[in-house]
């Protein structure tokens, strides 16, 4: 492994990357559009003071009047996953398996927090 013996798995990783470039790049626009919509929904919450500009499939929300831990607990109670991203930030990510129906459901669930 010291001399590259652990690199034999690199071919599997490279194959996944090649597949993604060949088959997924065009549909990334869908993830980005859903992320933008998700950010707009989050921006309506009183706990969210700012949504960073959404240019990809990542949404970052700045919180006010609550901690990321408290906010994430409320999200978790609605089966919504997020990640703490700083002292007052929470991050969300859309992906291939997050579709329009789930986006709509997300909107309904965050109204409950």
Please identify what each model-predicted range represents.
Residues 1-20:
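PLP-dependent aminotransferase class I/II
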Residues 71-78, 105-111:
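Short amphipathic alpha-helices in soluble, non-transmembrane regions
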């Amino acid at each position: 492994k010291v001399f590259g013996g652990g690199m034999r798995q690199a071919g599997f990783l490279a194959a996944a990357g090649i597949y993604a470039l060949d088959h997924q790049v065009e549909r990334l626009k869908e993830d980005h559009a859903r992320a933008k919509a998700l950010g707009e929904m989050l921006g309506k919450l009183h706990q969210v003071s700012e949504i960073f500009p959404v240019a990809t499939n990542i949404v970052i929300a700045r919180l006010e009047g609550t901690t990321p831990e408290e906010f994430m607990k409320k999200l978790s109670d609605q089966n919504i996953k997020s990640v703490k991203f700083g002292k007052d930030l929470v991050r969300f990510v859309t992906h291939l398996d997050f579709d329009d129906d789930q986006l709509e459901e997300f909107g309904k669930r965050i109204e409950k927090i």
